[in-house]
Design a protein with these regions (language model features):
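Active-site neighborhoods and metal-handling regions in enzymes and metal-associated proteins
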Residues: 1-259
């Protein structure tokens, strides 16, 4: 409706789901229930052919629970850390790792992971709850240049990591002025990942699966914006879309008011 009202077309099939832990869940036949989080990943194609790619997550009832709020603010902090590094000459892998470190701090604070956040990231423990890369190039394709494979997305001499999570990073080049990238960290509780002994076994000394079980049914949160790399500070092209806890609750709450 919003896209059509602007005379535009969708840049890709939108993801609208209460099962945010399923990363590309296009099924939309669920009934919204009190206490759930709704994740919307969508974007429009501009009249010049360029794509946008934005994600917001909000509480169906208009109010984050304490646990939802803590996780949401951790994802937002991770996004802020990553966005701040979107500057010329910065390696995109380092942008990703900055987001990972912020999320790892949350995991340690919540008792999901023991030890230091730095060790958690080095060993890939954070990826059990953030199993994808922090973003990708954005252009006339949503995942720009991806059809050309790693020879376009990775700088010469750089190869994909074999570590779970980091290996899904779509881009590993040094950022340049004029680049537009997405920054989209998330926090997900994925039963299949936490039940995979091949992933959790090597981390059993720092991973608290009993604590993780207490988060069962949480589903997922993702926050995504489109960032223009300039000669100076990063420019958030989608900053007008509310994303702070206060703004999200106010906007959703207002939409729920009768009349």
């Amino acid at each position: 409706g919003v896209i059509a009202a602007g005379g535009l077309v969708p840049a890709y099939t939108s993801i609208v789901t209460v099962r945010g832990e399923i990363l590309h869940n296009h099924g939309r036949d669920n009934l919204l229930e009190d206490g759930q989080l709704l994740l919307l990943d969508g974007g429009a194609e501009s009249i010049t052919g360029y794509a946008t790619d934005v994600t917001r997550t909000w509480p169906v009832n208009g109010q984050f629970s304490p646990r939802q709020k803590a996780a949401y603010e951790a994802v937002l902090a991770a996004q802020h850390a990553a966005i701040d590094l979107c500057r010329p000459g910065v390696r995109y892998r380092d942008v990703h790792l900055a987001a990972c470190l912020e999320l790892a701090r949350f995991l340690v604070d919540e008792g999901l992971v023991r030890g230091s956040p730095e060790d958690a990231v080095a060993r890939g423990a954070h990826a059990l709850f953030f199993p994808h890369g922090v973003g990708h190039l954005l252009g006339m394709d949503v995942h720009d240049l991806e059809n050309f494979g790693d020879q376009a997305a990775y700088a010469p001499g750089r190869e994909r990591s074999t570590q779970f999570g980091l290996g899904y990073l779509r881009l590993d080049r040094d950022l340049e002025p004029g680049n537009v990238v997405t920054i989209e960290p998330g926090f997900y509780v994925v039963p299949a990942i936490l039940a995979d002994e091949g992933l959790t076994g090597p981390l059993r000394d720092i991973l608290d699966l009993d604590r993780a079980a207490e988060w069962s049914g949480f589903c997922g949160i993702r926050i995504e914006d489109d960032i223009h790399v300039t000669e100076g500070d990063p420019e958030n092209l989608t900053a007008a879309i509310p994303k702070t806890v206060a703004d999200v609750e106010a906007r959703v709450g207002a939409a729920m008011m009768p009349g």
